[in-house]
């Protein structure tokens, strides 16, 4: 598979490499992504990718960073649409998270399974920004559910993230022996989980 040399000749090699990596991962998973094959897919020489990325992990970090930035934008829009009702805002953030994972499973895989390390400050900052939106929603939920026995806001944010990430992981990515068919849509599964959790906090329908 080749995406041609046009991008390279027009000085857009970096963008062509990121897009080629995203397509390869979407087709084969992270295990099917190698630098040499990436060069072939982008239609350039084996040495060309190193002009922009020092190695495979650096390219994965760039793909992940871009993914987190888009996820942050999606979560922020969902949060703004759901306010002022904190339960609605949390639910919409969850749906936005799930929609992102389903729409771009390759970037999602790079974000959470790519193992680029913690040495890229831009990637860490982008990941923190995405979680900050979930934390903001959790803060609002906790403020509305103030009372004895309520978990701290950080724990609520982690619980919500766990529900979102766990549901997305069950439904995205290439087939694997450990994945089993589920008798429901991912949105329904996530909505039910969030509803049960929010009710335990005294929120929700």
Where on the chain are the PLM-derived regions?
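N-terminal intrinsically disordered/low-complexity leader segments
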Residues: 1-12, 173-175, 179, 205
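Generic hydrophobic, amphipathic alpha-helix propensity
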Residues: 13-22, 38, 63-71, 75, ...
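Helix-turn-helix
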Residues: 16, 20, 24-58
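Alpha-helical DNA-contacting segments of helix-turn-helix folds
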Residues: 16, 25, 60-67, 111, ...
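Solvent-exposed, amphipathic alpha-helical segments
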Residues: 20-27, 70-82, 163-170
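Hydrophobic alpha-helical connector segments
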Residues: 76-107, 128, 147-160
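Short secondary-structure transition hinges
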Residues: 92, 99-136, 178-183
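Amphipathic alpha-helical packing segments from all-alpha helical-bundle domains
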Residues: 119-143, 154-158, 184-199
